[in-house]
């Protein structure tokens, strides 16, 4: 088994329940956004790092990790060069991260700034990669495959920030499909060759899990404050490309 999980946003309870559902030899891929917004970013990161270091989890970078790690990197460069431009860039990235849900992580760690990002988080960031090449030519990344959407400025930023409505995206010749998180939807959804898995776990208590080998989909349903039926569904201009993924629901 090779199971892909989307955004967790501090839902360590859902991650733990999902991991326990599968046999001990199961391999996992996490699509990024472990931190921010939810109740236990710290515990989520610890679990992911433990699984990674045990050789069971491939960790991908999400836009929430990217905001904080780039703030920390600019702060490091400011210290090394005494360049005010780096200092300002660090403050801007850090403020953007806080506006996008980072205050929950600040509270968990008792507060910090770009110069003092906790070692736990930096060690987690050091294990992240941007994409994963799975079996059968299936590519995994946080938000989109490695393509350039001009308004995001670079391929890397597109992979971290793009939305389904920015696509469908051209895939590399050897890639048959791609799997992503990032955009919360009411149900796992295909748009052309792209599968979107994020069900807004931190709000809905729903975490999808897609097996890249058997193509089985499970939704682990825990406690949430918002029914996932209230999340958006993709419609309109891409209707001929959109189809939902059949899944089994497991209450946790």
Annotate the PLM regions:
Residues 1-47, 52:
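N-terminal active-site segment of His-dependent metallophosphoesterases
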Residues 4, 28-30, 59-60, 139, ...:
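Residue-level marker for buried hydrophobic side chains located in beta-strands
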Residues 7, 32-33, 62-63, 182, ...:
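Active-site glycine-centered loops adjacent to acidic/histidine catalytic or metal-binding residues
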Residues 9-10, 36, 66, 145, ...:
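Short, glycine/acidic-enriched loop or turn micro-motifs at the edges of active sites
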Residues 25-26, 54-56, 136, 174-175:
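A general structural motif
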Residues 38, 42-45, 49-130, 165-169:
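Active-site neighborhood of divalent metal-dependent phosphoester bond hydrolases
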Residues 95-196, 200-206, 212-228, 232-234:
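Acidic, His/Gly-enriched loop-helix segments that form or flank divalent-metal centers
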Residues 239-252:
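A short C-terminal boundary segment appended to hydrolase-like catalytic domains
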